Amino acid sequence: MLNRNYRGLLGTKLGMTQVWDANNRVVPVTVIQAGPNVVTQVKTPDSDGYSAVQLGYGEIDPRRINKPMRGHFETSGATPRRHLVELRTADAGNYRPGQQLTGEVFDAGQVVDVTGTSKGKGFAGVMKRHGFKGLGAGHGVERKHRSPGSVGGCATPGRVFKGLRMAGRMGHDRVTVAGLTIHAVDTERGFLLIKGAIPGPDGGLVFVRSAAKRPAPEPAAPVAAAAAGTGEEASA
């Protein structure tokens, strides 16, 4: 059973730039247009067997929506959206269909995971695609310098094993970069400034959510308040 509260948003990668931090150091950041997202469905353990929120992002011509999806959006009271994503979170009951979400759901310094579609490289050889060494530059090698070499024996095994790394289309894969830090949140323009690079080209769709491997720290304020109260009583 999921027992963590996650935050997530669909957005658009705008590009990279650099900013100065509090220590006057240059920080490379990626700018993301985060939202606005709209809640199109709320899933609960009673009705769906698990707790999740479905988010919609991006405008689309309503005439391009089929009847099942049109009914789905009408149920939530939201206008049709181009992209949909599901975010599993324990506090899905706090959301309501039609609710608008912006970059304010995140805080500066928060650690997030970013998912996007990597840039397509087209058909690539094994040296570029898999980092093969290639064959020798001389010593009798003729026009095979970037070849992978042997891919299987003649009699044994007499075939090519499944999954053997070969040349082929490179890139355009779903990639997740984990453990990135939000440098700043621009609430006026709806921008997220995330330290480092994220997958995909400028203008590509990305999904930003709370880091899965780094749970949020427990708040220390109640503990400090309780300790202070104990001290006052003891002194009295």
Curated annotation (Swiss-Prot):
Residues 221-236 have a biased composition (Low complexity). One of its GO terms (cellular component) is cytosolic large ribosomal subunit. InterPro entries: Ribosomal_uL3, Ribosomal_uL3_bac/org-type, Ribosomal_uL3_CS, Transl_B-barrel_sf. This is Large ribosomal subunit protein uL3. It comes from the Bacteria. Pfam families: Ribosomal_L3. HAMAP family: Ribosomal_uL3_B (MF_01325_B). Keywords: Ribonucleoprotein, Ribosomal protein, RNA-binding, rRNA-binding. Transmembrane segments: none annotated. Residues 215-236 are annotated as: Disordered. Part of the 50S ribosomal subunit. Forms a cluster with proteins L14 and L19. GO terms for molecular function: rRNA binding; structural constituent of ribosome. SUPFAM superfamilies: Translation proteins. One of the primary rRNA binding proteins, it binds directly near the 3'-end of the 23S rRNA, where it nucleates assembly of the 50S subunit. Belongs to the universal ribosomal protein uL3 family. PANTHER family: 50S RIBOSOMAL PROTEIN L3, LARGE RIBOSOMAL SUBUNIT PROTEIN UL3C. The keyword RNA-binding applies. GO terms for biological process: translation.
